[in-house]
């Protein structure tokens, strides 16, 4: 019986836990998930320096983690202990639970090492109430002329219930979507559907390079945000719902002057 570990690395190097390093050190194969999310300063070379000793490192894209997961199960069946190391938390906004289920069905031991995710970090930094967040959603790059309306519809549903929406931004072929690009996509959807989900005068919150020394978190109007320089990626956005008076007061501390 082998061990499959899902290891959350946190959102930057300073949030990698001792438990994460210990688990990786006890693995024969470390699969670094570079598809699900990005960090401002964690990459496979950082893991090589943190984890001592000889072992195999694999940089995994979507094809391995979702479409060819049998290869990971095969490693376990051959007696190798395998860790999948993910930015943030290994099970928040990922599909890795399917691997745990399959490994368990085949008689292997499974472990989960939680990490600080951008989801909880952003909520804390935004000063908004954690109880008032609805479903999160990813804004994806357009495909030819097709723009996926899912984020627009999720924001609409959340706003109708007075809830805030966290928008994850797409990562495709090593290119991370910027907050500016995401907002332009949403405004195009607003032009098409005209359901008053997002207006240029709405206040939003944008986080950039969260967890790193140069992180930024700014509240500003959509019309300002579309051309604002948020710096290097990764970026993430909150579309607020109805603000409690304490939230409205607190948000002033991060409001762009």
Curated annotation (Swiss-Prot):
<keyword id="KW-0489">Methyltransferase</keyword>
<feature type="binding site">
    <location>
        <begin position="117"/>
        <end position="118"/>
    </location>
    <ligand>
        <name>S-adenosyl-L-methionine</name>
    </ligand>
</feature>
<feature type="binding site">
    <location>
        <position position="89"/>
    </location>
    <ligand>
        <name>S-adenosyl-L-methionine</name>
    </ligand>
</feature>
<feature type="binding site">
    <location>
        <position position="169"/>
    </location>
    <ligand>
        <name>S-adenosyl-L-methionine</name>
    </ligand>
</feature>
<keyword id="KW-0949">S-adenosyl-L-methionine</keyword>
<dbReference type="InterPro" id="IPR000878">
    <property type="entry name" value="4pyrrol_Mease"/>
</dbReference>
<comment type="function">
    <text>S-adenosyl-L-methionine-dependent methyltransferase that catalyzes the trimethylation of the amino group of the modified target histidine residue in translation elongation factor 2 (EF-2), to form an intermediate called diphthine. The three successive methylation reactions represent the second step of diphthamide biosynthesis.</text>
</comment>
<feature type="binding site">
    <location>
        <position position="210"/>
    </location>
    <ligand>
        <name>S-adenosyl-L-methionine</name>
    </ligand>
</feature>
<feature type="binding site">
    <location>
        <position position="235"/>
    </location>
    <ligand>
        <name>S-adenosyl-L-methionine</name>
    </ligand>
</feature>
<dbReference type="GO" id="GO:0032259">
    <property type="term" value="P:methylation"/>
</dbReference>
<comment type="pathway">
    <text>Protein modification; peptidyl-diphthamide biosynthesis.</text>
</comment>
<comment type="subunit">
    <text>Homodimer.</text>
</comment>
<protein>
    <recommendedName>
        <fullName>Diphthine synthase</fullName>
        <ecNumber>2.1.1.98</ecNumber>
    </recommendedName>
</protein>
<keyword id="KW-0808">Transferase</keyword>
<dbReference type="Pfam" id="PF00590">
    <property type="entry name" value="TP_methylase"/>
</dbReference>
<dbReference type="InterPro" id="IPR014776">
    <property type="entry name" value="4pyrrole_Mease_sub2"/>
</dbReference>
<comment type="similarity">
    <text>Belongs to the diphthine synthase family.</text>
</comment>
<dbReference type="InterPro" id="IPR014777">
    <property type="entry name" value="4pyrrole_Mease_sub1"/>
</dbReference>
<dbReference type="InterPro" id="IPR004551">
    <property type="entry name" value="Dphthn_synthase"/>
</dbReference>
<feature type="binding site">
    <location>
        <position position="92"/>
    </location>
    <ligand>
        <name>S-adenosyl-L-methionine</name>
    </ligand>
</feature>
<dbReference type="GO" id="GO:0017183">
    <property type="term" value="P:protein histidyl modification to diphthamide"/>
</dbReference>
<dbReference type="GO" id="GO:0004164">
    <property type="term" value="F:diphthine synthase activity"/>
</dbReference>
<dbReference type="InterPro" id="IPR035996">
    <property type="entry name" value="4pyrrol_Methylase_sf"/>
</dbReference>
<feature type="binding site">
    <location>
        <position position="11"/>
    </location>
    <ligand>
        <name>S-adenosyl-L-methionine</name>
    </ligand>
</feature>
């Amino acid at each position: 019986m082998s061990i499959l570990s899902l290891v959350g690395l946190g959102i930057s190097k300073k949030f990698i836990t001792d438990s994460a390093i210990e688990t990786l050190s006890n693995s024969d194969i470390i699969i670094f998930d570079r598809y699900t999310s990005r960090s401002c300063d964690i990459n496979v070379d950082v893991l090589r320096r943190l984890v001592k000793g000889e072992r195999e490192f694999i940089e995994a894209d979507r094809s391995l983690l979702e479409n060819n997961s049998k290869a990971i199960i095969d490693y376990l069946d051959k007696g190798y202990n395998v860790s999948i190391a993910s930015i943030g938390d290994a099970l928040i906004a990922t599909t890795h639970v399917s691997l745990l289920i399959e490994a368990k069905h085949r008689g292997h031991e499974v472990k989960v090492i939680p990490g600080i995710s951008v989801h909880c970090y952003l909520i804390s930094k935004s000063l908004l109430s954690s109880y008032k967040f609805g479903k999160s959603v990813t804004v994806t790059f357009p495909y030819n002329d097709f723009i996926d309306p899912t984020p627009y519809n999720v924001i609409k549903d959340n706003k109708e219930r007075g809830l805030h929406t966290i928008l994850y931004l797409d990562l495709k072929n090593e290119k991370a979507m910027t907050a500016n690009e995401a907002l332009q996509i949403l405004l195009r959807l607003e032009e098409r559907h005209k359901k008053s989900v997002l207006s240029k005068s709405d206040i939003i919150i944008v986080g950039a390079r969260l967890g790193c020394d140069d992180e930024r978190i700014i509240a500003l109007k959509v019309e300002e945000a579309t051309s604002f320089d948020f710096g290097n990626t990764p970026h993430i956005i909150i579309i607020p719902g109805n603000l409690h008076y304490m939230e409205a007061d607190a948000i002033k501390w991060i409001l762009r002057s």
